């Protein structure tokens, strides 16, 4: 999806306020036919929109002794992704929005956040607490180190997305700014801030990131990926 399509989708989507509600009372008197309800005549769990619960409560408040609400979003425009569609290892606590592409054999670690429109190709690892912004493009066999930020480009709409080509290693807590292209086989040092394009097979580091050297055999040996971490069975 391009930026305008994503903006239109967010702007025109019906905003959602889903609730999980624990109910106690004389519930046999309550009509749950228009919502998702699990329980019995005295206790139950309700999954519904906020407005639906308000209607139920106002109508049947004399029958409801007590309730507790769990809410994890407010006026949400885009749902989280259905993780069952991915052939990847996705650990608990990763947050992945809908309309994200994740290739076979990828690893998404705890705390990673991946925004709408991002594309991650096969066998790439997104380490703990990484932020992948909207429309970011990440190639095959990459490692995005813990705490790194790959900037998104939903706003402003004119910005070009980050493109990270195949076999790139990005060190922990590095930041890659909007519109930057990181060439194939490159290495970004930990804590670097990348503000301009990186030529293929380059090592860059610093704030802002500067060219250090070309990737050599010694560097490759120190930064090789472990295939076993990407096995799904």
From Swiss-Prot:
GO MF annotations, alphabetized: tetrahydrodipicolinate N-acetyltransferase activity
CDD domains per record: LbH_THP_succinylT
Disulfide bonding pattern of the chain: none
The keyword ATP-binding is annotated on this UniProt entry: no
EC number: 2.3.1.89
Known pathway: Amino-acid biosynthesis; L-lysine biosynthesis via DAP pathway; LL-2,6-diaminopimelate from (S)-tetrahydrodipicolinate (acetylase route): step 1/3
Record field: catalytic activity: (S)-2,3,4,5-tetrahydrodipicolinate + acetyl-CoA + H2O = L-2-acetamido-6-oxoheptanedioate + CoA
Top-rank taxon, per record: Bacteria
InterPro entries from the UniProt entry: DapH, DapH_N, Hexapep, Hexapep_transf_CS, Trans_hexapeptide_repeat, Trimer_LpxA-like_sf
Keywords: Acyltransferase, Amino-acid biosynthesis, Diaminopimelate biosynthesis, Lysine biosynthesis, Repeat, Transferase
GO biological process terms held by the UniProt record: diaminopimelate biosynthetic process; lysine biosynthetic process via diaminopimelate
Known role: Catalyzes the transfer of an acetyl group from acetyl-CoA to tetrahydrodipicolinate.
Family membership noted in the UniProt record: Belongs to the transferase hexapeptide repeat family. DapH subfamily.
Protein's name according to its UniProt entry: 2,3,4,5-tetrahydropyridine-2,6-dicarboxylate N-acetyltransferase
Gene that this polypeptide is encoded by: dapH
């Amino acid at each position: 999806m391009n930026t305008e399509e994503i903006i239109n989708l967010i702007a025109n989507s019906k905003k959602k306020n889903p609730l999980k509600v624990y109910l106690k009372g004389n519930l046999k008197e309550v009509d749950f036919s228009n919502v998702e309800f699990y329980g019995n005549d005295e206790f139950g769990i309700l999954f519904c929109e906020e407005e639906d619960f308000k209607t139920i409560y106002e109508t049947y408040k004399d029958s409801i002794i007590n309730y507790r609400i769990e809410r994890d979003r407010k006026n949400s425009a885009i749902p989280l992704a259905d993780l069952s569609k991915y052939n990847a290892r996705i650990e608990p606590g990763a947050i992945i929005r809908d309309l994200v592409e994740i290739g076979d054999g990828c690893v998404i670690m705890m705390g990673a956040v991946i925004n709408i429109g991002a594309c991650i190709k096969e066998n790439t690892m997104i380490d703990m607490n990484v932020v992948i912004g909207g429309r970011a493009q990440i190639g095959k066999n990459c490692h995005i180190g813990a705490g790194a930020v790959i900037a998104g480009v939903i706003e402003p709409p004119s910005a070009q997305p980050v493109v990270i080509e195949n076999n790139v290693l990005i060190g922990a807590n590095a930041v890659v700014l909007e519109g930057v292209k990181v060439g194939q086989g490159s290495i970004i040092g930990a804590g670097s801030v990348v503000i301009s394009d990186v030529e293929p097979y380059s090592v860059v580091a610093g704030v802002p990131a500067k060219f250090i050297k070309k990737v050599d055999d010694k560097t490759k040996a120190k930064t090789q990926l472990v295939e076993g971490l990407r096995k799904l069975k």
